[in-house]
Amino acid sequence: MVKIDLITGFLGSGKTTFIKKYAKYLLDKGMNIGILENDFGAVNVDMLLLQDLMGDNCELEMISGGCDKETHRRRFRTKLIAMGMCGYDRVIVEPSGIYDVDEFFDVLHDEPLDKWYEIGNVITIVDAKLEPELSEEADYLLASEAANAGSIILSRAEEATKEQIENTIEHLNRALEQVQCKRRLDREIMRKDGAELSKEDFDKILKSGYVAENYRKMELDEKKGFDSLYFMELKISADELKTQVAKMMQDPECGGIFRVKGFVKDDAGSWMQLNATGHEISMKPIGDGQQVVIVIGERLKEDCIRKYLEN
């Protein structure tokens, strides 16, 4: 049977960065792997960030969101059936930061997937400097992603103070309590950033498995507040985009923006990757890109956001 891992993490937590490290570790062990990008929106930016992993022993597949729950589940199941015929040793599923974890377990119990795949690990990435106050819906997503995790990695731990790390762990456990989950997290948490993880750390992660935990479910239609907005072919410089994103993330009239990501060309015509969260905004060179900016958050106001990006 093919081992399959789920790697979750709330918006902007650093899942894709961790997956690059984890995939390289698996490739160094001689494994043949497939990575399935399962995004919330209709455009998948993270696929471009993983392109350098592609090779004889690593293939990338994609499911775009932007559809209803049943359609998305059907696409996920169909893609896993196709990948089950490719001879992989391991499949890594990276969903969006807004994901119903139950879908993963439910689909893998369907025939014929229950005979082809064995769940390996559920790994959750959490920002070590997690916002102290989130909405009820956001806390639910945080709890639902952590509840079944065999290991939890604190991204950006090297940038966080000891107090911030402890506050993040307290927040995780508080979110679990709010959904009536009995689990409390401590030993499962690796207080290291992905860049600091050693081979021995990855050996532990590879064997961490998952936990079948119960908690009070919130129906997806109760989370209508989560949105993703797409802005294509913007006529804006890289420097100006970074400035405008910083302003709109501080403007409550735009809604609650969790994450902004995408690509833009600089003055020399080279691609730059934008990645913005509540903690930082970065603009880094990248080999290839797509002229798109994606804004993800709660109850977003498109007209207000568009003014920042297009005027």
Predicted segments, located by residue:
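C-terminal accessory "lid"/substrate-recognition subdomains
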Residues: 148-154, 159-287, 299-302, 310
